[in-house]
Amino acid sequence: MTVFDLPKIYTLFNACALLHIILGLVMIKMGQRKAHVASMTIALLFSAAFLGCYLYYHYHAGHVKFAGTGMTRPIYFILLFTHIPLAVLNLPMIIMTVVPAMRNRFDKHKRMAKWTVPIWLYVSVTGIIVYLMCYVWYGPPIRGWESGTG
């Protein structure tokens, strides 16, 4: 395995996190608090594993350029440019949602979760789509050193 295999792995982590976020939502709607906590904890762990792999990959692999052409480019960049700021915003929002729950402040937890969960879901889904567009459907991506642009 090389560093260039990491996008597959971190996207799998992202997909697992997405499934556990959805499961956690279903569980709390059904009144299954313990199952909700377990599922959301697993989602957090998968998200943390994703972030670690993602950062490691981009530190070692460098910049990658989208190889798609035509109308796929604006679609890709619209997804990417909505995904990135929401992904950055999402981490502190997740923390601000989890900490009150850990302190049994479920009123505050619920208020924050109403904002955090939709963003977390959007970031997870668009992250998977960005991966598919960049590495599977229109890839592989062009790395800066391969294109001669640095």
What is the predicted function of each stretch?
Residues M1-G150:
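Alpha-helical membrane insertion/targeting regions
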